[in-house]
């Protein structure tokens, strides 16, 4: 190699003057092709790598499974819940599996790793902003907001709902989603249109299915369906807004305590014993609901998490204002 280089230099000097390559160009020739080959052999980056996702309702059920799903695909996740201990429990469960990173120094969450737990009250603008502030301080911004929090209230013994019940159900199920998305809008606008942000809200197929005993809940979900469409208009072009509408999810849901499960079994004339465990009773009820669907399948939190993950990501980048049913084929919820 040395002799060849000397020969080239002598040949150049015989004609005119030898001028060596700039050091950067020589480096590019010698090393860049090798580095490029190394990059091409690296595994493909996960779909939500380097993205930050806030999951409101992450303390249980659909929200918990959604947080786990996003972390599995590389996201940094803020587990938020009205029950701060439940939110932190989900965060701790995830951290135990994936480990902790170094976080961001000086933020108070310097050992946060990929996930943190925070408190959020989706009916309180200050609480929502505080949760978002912690997300931004920990991870630098927010790419997606997922809202799975909700409430079901049963009527009294006479089948009536009080005004206070109506107000609380609508405050959580309808006004809450608006407040959460509206507060996120300010962050999305500051980050810019190029960030391709998204919001996914859990509504319900009960929004279009009329039945006795749940008029407040069903009406609030009908309102939230249209709020999603309005938010899609309001947040464009900074973020897409969509909804995932599940059929009844019994597994892991705080909306199905033992008392409600037993009341539902009695309502549908399903035989049960009070000696059975809560899990056994829930499985019976889930089996009944599954039998009403075209696929005869129980609807699980994992099913909803998968749909939410899809709606939040780039694979649905051309979709906004959509209410996406994940109900096993509940024909009563077919729109007409």
Per-region residue spans from a language model:
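Alpha-helical segment proximal to the catalytic Tyr-Lys
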Residues: 186, 233-237, 317
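Substrate-binding pocket helix/loop in short-chain dehydrogenase/reductase
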Residues: 156-158, 162-167, 289
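Short C-terminal tail/terminal secondary-structure segment
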Residues: 152-155, 308-309, 320-336
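Active-site loop immediately N-terminal to the catalytic Tyr-X3-Lys motif
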Residues: 158, 209-215, 296, 314
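Canonical Rossmann dinucleotide-binding motif of NAD(H)/NADP(H)-dependent dehydrogenases/reductases
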Residues: 47-78
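Active-site helix of classical SDR
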Residues: 181, 220
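Residue(s) in the substrate-gating loop at a strand-loop-helix junction
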Residues: 204
